[in-house]
């Protein structure tokens, strides 16, 4: 399924912050691929978050730089302005998602088909996922509920990632399992997060070590969410 391979690894990062620049450099160094989920009406805006008594930059990448910075990776929907979709009516849910998809498609010059739900849990429900499937051009949508699993999932509109990128113990445990697997059916190792979170405890080096560990395996296909989920 994955270029003749049974195992595939993919990453997914939200918000389109300037820390993505460093992240892309690391991913490219090790031949890894990610999907980056952007809010088109927030692009270029300055911002910061107060986390653990630290002020962490949450400044968004400028629209004019998107194509260059994310070259070789996938761009996907994260809604126009990052609302909690469970608090919105149906029409606004559709507008937030479909207009973001159209904006990003126009910006990138190709059709955007992926999505990640914005905000902390609960940030979606089955009614919302059905609205997305029925009324937008989105073909898959990722949740923030990690399942610690590699199995293929039937419902691509409530797609659960395997692991969160800062859960190091779980990440390495799953990575060891994934590397050792000799599956007869297709398996996906899906990792998600936000690149600004590496700044909180300065964990960039730890992430690079993980990338080095999981990369360059002959039996693993390294691709974007779209390449793997819509194969």
Give the ranges of each region predicted by the language model:
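C-terminal domain-boundary segment and adjacent tail
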Residues: 1-3, 29-31, 35, 40, ...
């Amino acid at each position: 399924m994955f270029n003749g391979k049974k195992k595939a690894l993919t990453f997914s990062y939200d918000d389109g912050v300037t820390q993505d620049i460093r992240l892309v450099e690391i991913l490219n160094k090790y031949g890894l691929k990610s999907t980056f989920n952007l809010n088109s009406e927030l692009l270029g805006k300055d911002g910061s978050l107060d986390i653990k008594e630290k002020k962490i930059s949450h400044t968004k990448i400028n629209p004019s730089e998107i194509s260059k910075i994310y070259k070789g990776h996938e761009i996907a929907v994260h809604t126009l302005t990052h609302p909690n979709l469970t608090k919105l009516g149906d029409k606004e849910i559709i507008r937030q998602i479909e207009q973001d998809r159209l904006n990003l498609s126009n910006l990138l010059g190709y059709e955007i088909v992926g999505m990640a739900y914005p905000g902390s849990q609960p940030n979606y429900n089955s009614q919302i996922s059905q609205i997305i499937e029925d009324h937008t051009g989105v073909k898959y949508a990722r949740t923030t509920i990690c399942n610690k699993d590699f199995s293929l999932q039937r419902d691509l509109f409530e797609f659960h990632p395997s692991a969160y990128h800062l859960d190091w113990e779980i990440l390495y445990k799953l990575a060891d399992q994934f590397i050792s697997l000799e599956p007869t059916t297709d398996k996906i190792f899906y990792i998600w997060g936000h690149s600004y979170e590496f700044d909180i405890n300065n964990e960039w080096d730890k992430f690079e070590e993980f990338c080095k560990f999981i990369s360059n395996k002959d039996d693993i296909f390294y691709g974007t969410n779209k390449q793997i989920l819509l194969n």
